[in-house]
Amino acid sequence: MKARSVVTLSDVAERAGVSLATASRVINGGTRAVSPHYRDRVLAAASDLGYTPNAHAQAMARGRSKMIGLVVHDIADPYFSAIAAGAISLAGSRGLLVLGNTLHNPDYEFEYVSTMRAQRAQALILVGSRTTDVEHTRRLTDEVAEFIEGGGRVAAVSQDTLGADTVLPENRAGAHALAAALITEGHRRFAVLGGPKTLLTARDRVEGFQDALAEQGLEPPVVIEGAFTRDGGYTAMCGLLDLPDHPPCVFAVNDVMAIGAMAAVRERGLRVPGDVAVAGFDDIPTLRDVAPTLTTVRLPLAEMGRLAASMVLDDEPRTTPRVAPIAGEVVLRESTIR
């Protein structure tokens, strides 16, 4: 059987009886108007022939493509995937193509922004964690500035140092409120599974928790660093349980670390919360399957993604970046009941 040939824009123009330039203006959205009569003829011809538009040609004709680049550190992490889902739900409703993601690799982050700029993407949404790496932040800020100068829109979640619109969770205040709630519940000795010191999100949560204990005249928590992952929480908790007379109430700075920490407690033949109370942060969707139910600080993750998407999709002119603070809500559950 003879292979079907690829339908070109020239084929569409010939079928419609118009010039190639006219067909291009209809299909690719050029700046010059086309009369309804010829527009209908071109669209009918394209439909009859099964023509698929060239996305790059459309971007060149319009000055911007319909793409939104979605840069996510780890799409497998429920925190990032929930935010991404919110962004995608809004962008998809606008008929826009949303692309993902990076893999915790700063070099991929730069390459992704650069590629989206070269592809004339309409917008970028950056969903990542702030870092203490000054050089990384400088390079990413420069890439973002070039993207914006080229006419693109950028919004970030958590990263408030990039010169872009930002959805900013109040990590320090949320951890402070959690500590205060746990103290009210009768807890007095604490440990914190703190995540890497290079992540400012983790650092803010640790410091907010520490501040609340200090305000109540309690001993500083034992802080153990670990990867910002389930396995990081598991390993950090194992280290804590090896300490003599370890604190009986543990705050893991995100929920996936808390889930790993609870697994470590169970493996030692101990009970949550009977022997060790555990709390997390974020209220990721998968917590509905965790037993006992996990005390945490709830962030509206999907709404944060939608808000970031709305920031890059609106047409309001502005000269300074906007910052939308997002408050956390303490949710007390079974894992910290005394």
PLM regions and their residue ranges:
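Bacterial carbohydrate/catabolite-sensing allosteric modules
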Residues: 1-2, 48, 89-94, 134, ...
